[in-house]
Amino acid sequence: MGPEYQDIELASFMSTSKGYMGECGFRGGYCEAINFDPDVRVQLLKSISAKLCSSVSGQAAMDVVVNPPTSSEPSYQLFVKEKEQVLGDLKEKAKMVTETFNSMDRMSCNVVQGAMYAFPQIDMPPAALEEAKKRGVPADVMYCFELLEKTGICVVPGSGFGQRPGTYHFRTTILPPVEKLKEMLERFRIFHEQFLSTYK
């Protein structure tokens, strides 16, 4: 990183289920801590050691992640091709999801980068806030349940992630194949327009 950064503390994380290989369900990962104070490293190691370790299959998957095929191995070209395809598809889907949500009324979405999820924010209409209050649920929960009931699309309310009070988000994945994702986003758009019309 260059001499000007040689003393900066840096932590890097990698996960088998959240990396570009996307092997969801395998609970494996690592943390690399560079330039951390030795006392902090000891506490980090204690904390990590006190937790349950990954299953054998998760550890095996992690070994594959950190030891990909090398150029001298027969599977290398296929590995590179598949990796580039996966990363290219994720980039395309991230752009599609971000642009679609940002094109909707009363919705904004940060650029999806480095994750397989988007966290759009909804500028909730006052009538929707009132209805949610009557139902005794957070407005984002009401939105997500109505979305599920009317479209079959399952997203996670932002209130489950500790969002700032007075803001309303949801989390959705960008993992479905491109064609299914396009279809889902169109159904989402129709629902969102109807939701805004209902609670205008």
Residue map of PLM features:
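PLP-dependent class I/II
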Residues: 1-200
